[in-house]
A protein has these predicted regions:
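Hydrophobic residues within membrane-embedded alpha-helical segments of Major Facilitator Superfamily
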Residues: 20, 70-72, 197, 204, ...
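Interfacial loop-to-helix transition and helix-capping segments at the boundaries
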Residues: 56-69, 136-149, 181-200, 235-263, ...
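Aromatic-anchored segments of alpha-helical transmembrane domains
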Residues: 19, 23-26, 172-186, 225-239, ...
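Membrane-cytosol interface segments of multi-pass membrane proteins
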Residues: 1-175, 311-357
Length: 357
């Protein structure tokens, strides 16, 4: 399979991953920790039914099982392609490029965008501004920008591993991945957890042509296998959570992640063969502005939830109609707003376009 076809498959995976982020962020009504958070369930009047909310929240849970491992695997596969093409001449230039593309946006958008919007939404309550900034930068508070920090560290480590990559590497990496479930500091646990997926993506690229050719001969069979495995593992993940064993939960989640990524790749590879799919204006827009959409979209959810509470009330937000309305509004508004914010950022600061594209 030629390089252009590889790029098509990976490009479509990137589009799918961005859309999964938007979808998975449109359902939560409760999120946070000791440094701040939102809990619109607690504001609901006594007797309010949470049935529909919990059903929709299970969809979010299932997407979370694989969509961020998918993001990391795509990055690993693309890095393996770059290594094949001899793009990077040394670690210094590589580290500097990753710092500029990942860590500077992480710092800038956390300080100047994420925290101010969370304050506006009431997320931080009585937490002072310095504590709020510190908790987000150190990942002590939940921040969707953890991905930028994690990818930066993972990429630096993978720079030395990918050129020497062998299949047996996955075993110790999986061990590190499991141990991360017991590490309480996100600054350390997240790179430990996601290095496995980055390397798995790089490993997949080494065998991709052979595997893809084989998948094509039995496409329906593999689709059935991956779909069945994903459904079973997702249900099992929901079940084992009651035991409170982090390693067991991580193991089952890993199986679901692999099945979800396999299923998504088959879908992307099929779409890559559809003439004109990548040329559609929608797909091009998501591809070009994907990083910015990721950066700008999620904090807007907190603001929309506060507006929803003011207009519908907690009980109204939790009714079936309220849930559907809020999800549609959150998906459309955050997606469109993030897209136009990305374009505005590029127009105002063209020399910093790589921060969001």
């Amino acid at each position: 399979m030629g390089t252009s076809k590889k790029v098509k498959a990976y490009s479509i995976l990137r589009v799918i991953a961005i859309l999964l982020v938007l979808i998975s962020h449109m359902t939560y009504y409760k999120v946070g920790n000791a440094f701040g958070g939102i809990d619109y369930l607690a504001l609901a009047p006594s007797g309010t039914s949470f049935k529909w909310y919990f059903i929709f929240d299970k969809v979010r849970y299932v997407i979370y099982l694989f969509h961020m491992p998918l993001f990391m695997a795509i990055s690993g596969a693309l890095f393996a392609l770059q290594i094949k093409k001899g793009r990077w001449s040394g670690f210094g230039s590589f580290a500097e490029a990753k710092w500029q593309r990942l860590m500077i946006p992480y710092l800038v958008f956390t300080l100047l965008y994420l925290v101010p919007l969370k304050y506006l939404s009431g997320y931080f309550g009585q937490t002072n501004f310095l504590m709020a900034e510190g908790s987000q930068l150190t990942l002590l508070g939940n921040s969707h920008l953890w991905y930028l920090y994690t990818l930066f560290l993972v990429a630096l480590i993978a720079y030395f591993l990918v050129p020497r990559m062998q299949v047996w590497y996955l075993l110790p990496l999986w061990g590190i991945h499991l141990v991360s479930a017991y590490v309480g500091l996100s600054l350390i646990s997240l790179p430990m957890e996601f290095l496995l997926w980055y390397m798995l993506g790089a490993m997949f690229e080494s065998y991709r042509e052979t595997l893809t050719s084989y998948f094509r001969t039995k496409r329906a069979v593999f689709l059935t296998i991956w779909l069945t495995a994903f459904i079973v593992c997702s249900l099992l993940s929901l079940y084992v959570g009651r035991f409170g064993i982090p390693a067991l939960q991580r193991l089952v989640n890993d199986l679901a992640a692999v099945a979800g990524m396999g299923l998504t790749y088959l879908l992307a590879e099929s779409l890559a063969q559809q003439k004109g799919f990548l040329e559609s204006s929608f797909v091009k827009a998501v591809l070009l502005n994907g990083l910015g959409i990721y950066i700008f979209s999620d904090p807007l959810n907190y603001v929309l939830l506060r507006l929803g509470q003011a207009l519908l009330g907690p009980a109204g937000m939790l009714s079936l109609g309220g849930l559907v309305l809020m999800m549609i509004l959150r998906l459309v508004i955050t997606g469109l707003a993030a897209y136009y914010l990305t374009r505005l950022f590029v127009r105002l600061w063209p020399n910093r376009a790589s921060w969001v594209r």
